[in-house]
């Protein structure tokens, strides 16, 4: 029992800074929306429309680079720290390649926005302007993630937390300058949010670069030691590990976007109630997601040490801690669901709808915790292809169709509206959680040599 308690402490020490970093990142989006909304409703809507395209694109790049964390953790655990710098340099090349791809997508985003039904031309113009501004921050954001993944792979999660919080503080005055046109800058409105966010990402990258070159714990990792040409073998291996994670993230984000579109014809009350429940669930999701990052680090590190048994301890402890936290947040959601809904909106019908959906959101949190932490454990084992197949099957082949049947048709029960989609979410996430656990159990039953060889690859 003692080894599980010790492991739980290590996991929480890694996870808490990740939670704070994620909150800072989310708060940046909230600040953008509020400050754009103070100019006009059109500017706020433009930022919202732009963000709906920006998020899937940038999360694809983010997911691709997550392959670095278990790679660095495994090299660190196995005492091969001298090889870390080369992996990270290739991470920069990979980030540069995917940056060009994402920037091309964002540059041509006007074609996507113009296809939206009855979109106001002024809103469309501002949304495109926002995307054309924020796209210059793509390399800065992904370069920052490369160095953040290096630090997290070395079990250093606090730098990401501190720099993320500083980024939030810097974002507010830069937003003010470019939104309202202060200190000689043009008044860009919602487009100014894109300029500010792009600028902040470069500031965050430079701060992280400054940290890794001066941190005593990383003095032996010489990133600046001469020019490193692309190593296509390493980049191919990192891409092979990262691409399934990137696609899984992309499919998850687009799933929620599709559900939002399917709910939209059901009326303002249904849409508002759904959005409140989803927004609050997203906040609660940060807890298991941070444990997922910690699980990747601990499992990767233990496998690097050659300790398959300790990797199992890390995997089971992360799951247990995640379920415990999810149980607490689920009870909190059930007890305070009406009070939470009132924070978002005071309309009685909307509060009633949101309160009803939050009962389902409470159940959703338990399955969500297991599946996202399971994903982190599998990343630690470098078994990322299974993550893609499990999430695609669970979300798109089970969750969405069952949600559609329950929410909008009378085939099974009378159409349930948004509640049907939330039951679909629960079905999909529960399936994902079960499949993740089964996959982890299968992996752990393999011969030790197979597990260690796979992790070292």
Curated annotation (Swiss-Prot):
Keywords for this protein: Antiport, Cell inner membrane, Cell membrane, Ion transport, Membrane, Sodium, Sodium transport, Transmembrane, Transmembrane helix, Transport
Record flagged with keyword Iron: no
Compartment list: Cell inner membrane
Query: What GO terms describe the biological role, i.e. biological process, of this protein?
Result: sodium ion transport; xenobiotic transmembrane transport
Please name the InterPro entries in this protein's record. Answer: MATE_fam, MATE_MdtK, MdtK-like, Multidrug-R_MdtK
Annotated Gene Ontology cellular component terms: plasma membrane
Task: Show the GO MF annotations.
Answer: antiporter activity; xenobiotic transmembrane transporter activity
Specify the protein's topology with respect to the membrane.
Multi-pass membrane protein
Keyword presence, Cell inner membrane = yes
Q: Which NCBIfam families match?
A: matE
Q: Which family does it belong to?
A: Belongs to the multi antimicrobial extrusion (MATE) (TC 2.A.66.1) family. MdtK subfamily.
Q: What is this protein called?
A: Multidrug resistance protein MdtK
What is the taxonomic lineage of the source species?
A: Bacteria, Pseudomonadati, Pseudomonadota, Gammaproteobacteria, Enterobacterales
């Amino acid at each position: 029992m003692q080894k599980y308690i010790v492991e739980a402490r290590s996991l929480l020490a890694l996870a808490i800074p990740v939670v704070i970093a994620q909150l800072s990142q989310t708060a940046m989006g909230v600040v953008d929306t509020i400050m754009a909304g103070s100019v006009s409703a059109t500017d706020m809507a433009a930022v919202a429309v732009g963000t709906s395209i920006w998020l899937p694109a940038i999360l694809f790049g983010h997911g691709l680079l997550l392959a670095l964390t278990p790679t660095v953790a495994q090299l660190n655990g196995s005492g091969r720290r001298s090889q870390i710098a080369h992996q990270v340099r290739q991470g920069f090349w990979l980030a540069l390649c995917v940056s060009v791809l994402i920037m091309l997508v964002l540059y041509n985003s006007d074609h996507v926005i113009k296809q939206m039904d009855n979109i106001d031309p002024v809103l469309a113009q501002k949304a495109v302007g926002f995307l054309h501004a924020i796209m210059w921050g793509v390399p800065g954001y992904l370069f920052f993630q490369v160095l953040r993944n290096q630090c997290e792979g070395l079990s250093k999660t606090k730098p990401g937390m501190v720099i993320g919080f500083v980024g939030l503080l810097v974002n507010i005055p830069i937003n003010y300058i470019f939104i309202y046109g202060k200190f000689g800058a043009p008044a860009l409105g919602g487009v100014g949010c894109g300029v500010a966010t792009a600028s902040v990402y470069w500031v965050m990258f430079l701060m992280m670069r400054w940290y890794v070159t001066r941190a005593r714990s990383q003095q032996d990792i010489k990133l600046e030691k001469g020019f490193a040409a692309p190593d296509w073998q390493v980049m191919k291996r990192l891409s092979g590990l990262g691409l399934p994670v990137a696609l899984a993230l992309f499919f998850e984000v687009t799933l929620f976007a599709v559900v939002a579109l399917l709910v939209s014809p059901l009326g303002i009350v249904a849409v508002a109630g759904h959005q409140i429940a989803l927004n609050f669930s997203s906040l609660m999701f940060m807890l298991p997601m941070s444990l997922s990052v910690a699980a990747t680090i601990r499992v990767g590190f233990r496998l690097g040490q050659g300790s398959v048994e300790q990797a199992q301890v890390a995997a089971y402890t992360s799951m247990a801690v995640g379920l415990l936290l999810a149980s607490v947040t689920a009870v909190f959601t059930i007890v305070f669901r009406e009070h939470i809904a009132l924070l978002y909106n005071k309309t009685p019908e909307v509060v009633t709808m949101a309160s009803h959906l939050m009962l389902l959101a409470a159940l959703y949190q338990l399955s969500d915790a297991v599946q996202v932490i399971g994903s982190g454990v599998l990343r630690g084992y470098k078994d990322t292809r299974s993550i893609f197949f499990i999430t695609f099957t669970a979300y798109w082949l089970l969750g969405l169709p069952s949600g559609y049947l329950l929410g909008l048709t009378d085939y099974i029960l009378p159409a349930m509206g948004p509640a049907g989609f939330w039951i679909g979410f629960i079905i999909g996430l529960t399936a994902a959680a079960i499949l993740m656990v089964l996959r982890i159990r299968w992996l752990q039953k393999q011969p030790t040599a197979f597990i260690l060889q796979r992790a070292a690859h």
